[in-house]
Amino acid sequence: GTAVSEPVIELSHVSYSYSLSPRERRRWHKRSAVAGKSSKQALWGNDPSSPWALRDVSLTVCRGEFLGLAGHTGSGKSTLVQHLNGLIRPQEGFVRALGLDLSNKKDAAAVKAKVGVVFQYPERQLFAETVTQDVAFGPHNLGLPQDEVDRRVESSLSRVGLDLSTVGDKSPFELSGGQQRRVAFAGVLAMEPEVLVLDEPMAGLDPAARRDFLELIDRLHRDGLTVVMVSHSMDDLANCCDRIVVMNEGAVFAEGTPAQVFAHADELKSIGLGVPAAQRMALALAEAGV
């Protein structure tokens, strides 16, 4: 049978609003209760004017899995990603990561190194004079001894396919866009996280660089990292992920293996998402009775 998977990150009934103050949130609940609905129903009804970016989201990330997050801009994926390592704390519900409660400030700080987040276009956050300094920034901040920092810089550059002796002393801005992104990845890997969270990691790359990056991410996963990847490319998700969670209007719309999720082509189409090319082909053949 399958081994029981160990949860590394758990979200339980998480809701988050960018626009409502705590007082307004209480009023919103009260108003719904007065309207004779349970507050949950009123909150999570498909109200397009809803000020909630996340609505009652429950989700578990298991150790060692490759989890895909899909959904349109505005579906809540990016807000969700920022909850995974305490960058945003939930206003309702709770998040536990690596056994720690992220509503606790001290615990949230401890988790930041262990759950590494690579945001969209991460090369825009490069700032140091040399590649080495940029990658060393995180480990230095952890207060590690210099020889350990050096070891991590070399090993994380090599994990993203860059050679310290070739690029270490260069300015990150002398490198190609794809290489700059690798340097940004290395900076997160140098923290030696247990979970790697990637928000649209292939955004803006040409097809060849995309393929290289997917291979890189796949290799990091095979080497033992738990990976959560946000992507609007259904093909990428179908190729890499063990499990996919589809977000829509701040709530979990569907979840399952790629085959389970993509079997619901019509429902996905209704929220503006396609299915991967291979899946479309299979559907077309099935419809043609082949």
Question: Which residues does each predicted region cover?
Answer:
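Helix-to-loop junction immediately C-terminal to a conserved catalytic motif
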Residues: N85
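Catalytic Walker B motif of ABC-type/P-loop ATPase nucleotide-binding domains
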Residues: L196-D199
